[in-house]
Amino acid sequence: MVSEIHVISKRDLSKHETVAVDLPLPQLGVSSIRVRTSLIGITSNNLSYAKLGDMLQWWNTWPVPLDAPAPYNDRAEWGIVPAWGFARVLESNIKAIPAKSLLYGYWPTSSHPVDLSLVPSEPEGHFREVSEHRQGLGNIYNRYNLVDESAQSEEYQAWFANVSPIWNCGYVMNRFTFATEFKPVHPLGVGAGEWTEKDADLSSAVVVSLSASSRTGRSFSWNLARDRKSDGGPLALLQATSAPDSLKANPKAAFEIKTVNYSELAAKDTIDWIAKLQPKRVVVADFGGRPKETEEFREAIKSTLPESTVFTNIQVGGEPKIMAPEEALKSMAIFKKWGLVQLNTTGIVDAGITVEGAGKYFDGAESTFRRFLEEESVADLELIWGSGVGGTNGIEKAWENIIQGTLSPQKAWVYRLE
């Protein structure tokens, strides 16, 4: 059967092709399944998977098939960017995973059949990929779980594929890093360094969310407002975004929420608003804010508040673009200047599973995500359905939009490949 694979040059991410293949299918290995990607979400996060593909081994998730046509079978030069979503089981020799069942996880942006080697995990219905070439991946990327299709509409699955993987970052930040119920977890995860109850305490802090209308930014704001003890803080939340109108319907919160455009971020009115709250601490969570305006804000707020004010800078994401070498060097200098703390969602998720137990963790995360959707937290986003790998309605076009910076953040892009 002819399938399509979307391949990307590891050396030049703007160079990409859709390749038609008719691959021979070997005998299924022991404790294995064969699947085809069914429904996946595409966001600017997919660019991060490519930019950091070597460092975090995301390129190893789904290597290009060696029997694909040359030159696209050269794994040193070409790769497949993974995406979150659902896949249909074509064959299985694992009793707990029957053929035709649906799995959620991290899939290739292609329609060719792929094999997974799985062992049972916790809770029931979850499995762990144990192929040797994937062992450098973070645990969350090797986790797959069966889906009860009778309990999920296709529309819910689409929102889950596009929003939930990124939303999860804001959920674990609130629940485990700025914890009110558990021992706090360092933003990079267990073993990354000291992160005390004082570090987690937001009761006397103003939180500043940069790129607040991003999916991660929305998640963090909503979780602070709707999934936190009322006495756990913060004093207030400042949201900076290029699209303030998208955040008009703020979640109901026990604290004040102010939303500004980047041009207003370092303005006197904004700085005075923070100063009047007399915070002992300012926590800046950067989900991909504009560097110039962010730097101006940090300088302005630091020079205005008392010297005793504690500043905590959490770096979650960057601007969704390919960064030139000089921009990368400048970014590194800013990290050092402000003592930025990098966040790693995978490390916090691992800690959360350890603290709560896998069953409680995943049940809690999904039920909280459902509440997030029910409260219309992404009501301004338009769900856009695409299909296939190649062409103007397929994944190939989505990648071109990502590279060109024209993938609209106000749209939730999902693609049917089944």
Whereabouts are the PLM-identified features?
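Rossmann-fold NAD(P)-binding glycine/threonine-rich loop
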Residues: 301, 317-338
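N-terminal Rossmann-fold NAD(P) dinucleotide-binding loop
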Residues: 217-218
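C-terminal hydrophobic helical "lid"/dimerization subdomain
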Residues: 347-418
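ADP-ribose/adenylate-binding Rossmann-like module
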Residues: 284-287, 306-325
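NAD(P)H dinucleotide-binding glycine-rich loop of Rossmann-like/cofactor-binding domains
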Residues: 102-205
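Adenosine-nucleotide cofactor-binding segment
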Residues: 226-297
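Eukaryotic N-terminal targeting leaders
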Residues: 1-27, 416-418
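Glycine-rich beta-strand-centered segment in the early N-terminal region that forms part
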Residues: 24-41, 54-112
